[in-house]
Amino acid sequence: MPLYRKRLRLVRGEGVYVWDEKGRRYLDLIAGIGVNVLGHAHPEWVLDMSRQLEKIVVAGPMFEHDEREEMLEELSHWVDYEYVYMGNSGTEAVEAAIKFARLATGRSEIVAMTNAFHGRTLGSLSATWKKKYREGFGPLVPGFKHIPFNNVEAAKEAITKETAAVIFEPIQGEGGIVPADEEFVKTLRDLTEDVGALLIADEVQSGLRTGKFLAIEHYGVRPDIVTMGKGIGNGFPVSLTLTDLEIPRGKHGSTFGGNPLACRAVATTLRILRRDRLVEKAGEKFMEFSGERVVKTRGRGLMIGIVLRRPAGNYVKALQERGILVNTAGNRVIRLLPPLIIEGDTLEEARKEIEGVLNDIL
């Protein structure tokens, strides 16, 4: 289906590199938009997934299986939420979070942020900000309103006893790799507690990348609900909604959510991340970029945004021609979301090449 423009055709990947149909190699600094945290074709992950395919793939949500228990055990090394609801994509995790918030509070109003991105299904799209994603799909789900990101006074005015939940990204991804201010996050936590509303942290993109399992950990704040996706399964479609809320059995479900193959993907990914300390190491790999056309560098760890004085599109194309894959996050931001396995010297070489392109192209 012609939903996307024709672009580079990739045929295989290994580690931090991918190859096109002509055999040309590219350094992959976008990793499927933050998905392939272990890189491409990680041998241990591939072996575990291959063995699982020969064992059992889908069992249905009404049955127990060892893979789920193993996944929960691995997850317990990172977080201590009481309940984990599994889906197949980040947008499903957000949909679940919205449902849970409305069910738990008996309220319908959801406060979201300007420049936020939470997904493209109807509920998550209602929390998403950009007009280009929303246009043509109205009317969207009622009860959503947006406030300026990092604006404490706007939050104080918007969050009331009518609010079911506030949803935000600790680091806005599509919005330009913009970290939340500490005062803003703590204000959201205080305000939601004061009025009996819930705080939802969307970690679909920021999870795993900032030096901590969840980016929200940098703020010393515990959300009521956390959504995860993308890298949590290293490329296999899976998502998690984490909460201490007890949702009545049967109120939410998924045919494929929590299937044995998905649980295997998460369990193996988390095991490798923990053993090799890849999450902690990612926090040490943040890079600053400089040059006449660079305004500043934003982000944490391996979630990096290079803010430019000019539109980023031409630079993205030029980097592809030189064998480096990146993408944009807004009109003037180059986004880097490399695999967590990337080595420091490879990153340094990439930084020099990127700065060279930024300086060469008018």
From Swiss-Prot:
Q: Which residues bind substrate?
A: R120, S254
| Source organism per UniProt | Thermococcus kodakarensis (strain ATCC BAA-918 / JCM 12380 / KOD1) (Pyrococcus kodakaraensis (strain KOD1))
Cofactor binding mode and count: Binds 1 pyridoxal phosphate per subunit.
Q: Which residues carry this modification: N6-(pyridoxal phosphate)lysine?
A: K230
Question: Enzyme class, one word?
Answer: transferase
- Recorded protein name is Putative [LysW]-aminoadipate semialdehyde/glutamate semialdehyde transaminase
- PROSITE patterns from the entry? AA_TRANSFER_CLASS_3
Any idea which UniProt keywords this protein has?
Amino-acid biosynthesis, Aminotransferase, Arginine biosynthesis, Cytoplasm, Pyridoxal phosphate, Transferase
Any additional notes?
May also have succinyldiaminopimelate aminotransferase activity, thus carrying out the corresponding step in lysine biosynthesis.
Swiss-Prot/TrEMBL catalytic activity: [amino-group carrier protein]-C-terminal-gamma-(L-lysyl)-L-glutamate + 2-oxoglutarate = [amino-group carrier protein]-C-terminal-N-(1-carboxy-5-oxopentan-1-yl)-L-glutamine + L-glutamate; [amino-group carrier protein]-C-terminal-gamma-(L-ornithyl)-L-glutamate + 2-oxoglutarate = [amino-group carrier protein]-C-terminal-gamma-(L-glutamyl-5-semialdehyde)-L-glutamate + L-glutamate
